[in-house]
């Protein structure tokens, strides 16, 4: 159950694939697809996906990194767009799916927006049964607390992705020792004893220039594309209604990337448009936006 390089896709990536330990003869296990949020590194989600497997041993679990977010990616790997990420996810999912195979697809943060796009792709193979949108940045990300700061930073420093990636590489790879960099990351993120994997994942992220460049490059596009777009939400809702797909939202009430206004508007809109039996909306103050840092086990046991 480790993150591995995946070589069967057009764009460089890694996957975490956990086979079911409880099976039914004569039928494929449901395929749970997990799409991470930005920066798209699967290392952050190893613990979470492990706990998800323990809770649902009859599922095959497939975590797919963002394109470019793998250790074997070349340092000159270009910044892949949101559409590149959508096409990439569809390609990898299709390599594990087949016609009529039951798919449960979930995404975290911008991964939730990618999930919506993936579902609407006419190239996706399989039968989507349920969609999970976890601390989702699917609309008006630029109006959130962190979105406002990110938009301002990009306005004043247009080449932000390239500047920060260079600084991060020099500082965390060349100047700081591994032990001291872990110490700084731990203190800055407040990981504590339960966030060791998050510290390791963040150090991997910060010491690979192409990861930081890809992450901030994608974030810049998120600020421009993920705005007010009820027409897109209508398309997604109609697709789910026509195909009998259940929709689940998990919101954090103290999310710095999703404003309270956006959360309320989305919740009210979906309640008006989606049949009650196919919609579940959870709002909690028990997890932050980046719940996988210290709250992975709790989130899985409480909500998934």
UniProtKB/Swiss-Prot annotation:
Disruption phenotype: Accumulates lipid droplets. One of its GO terms (molecular function) is hydrolase activity, acting on ester bonds. Its EC number is 3.1.1.3. Keywords: Glycoprotein, Hydrolase, Lipid droplet, Membrane. Glycans are attached at residue 95. Optimum pH is 7.5. A motif (GXSXG) lies at residues 107-111. It is a peripheral membrane protein. The keyword Glycoprotein applies. It catalyses: a triacylglycerol + H2O = a diacylglycerol + a fatty acid + H(+). Optimum temperature is 30X degrees Celsius. Pfam families: LIDHydrolase. InterPro entries: AB_hydrolase_fold, LDAH. One of its GO terms (biological process) is lipid storage. The active site is at 109 (nucleophile). Gene3D superfamilies: alpha/beta hydrolase (3.40.50.1820). Residues 1-155, 177-304 are lumenal. PANTHER family: LIPASE, LIPID DROPLET-ASSOCIATED HYDROLASE. Shows both triacylglycerol (TAG) lipase and ester hydrolase activities. May play a role in TAG homeostasis. Belongs to the AB hydrolase superfamily. LDAH family. This is Lipid droplet-associated triacylglycerol lipase. It comes from Saccharomyces cerevisiae (strain ATCC 204508 / S288c) (Baker's yeast).
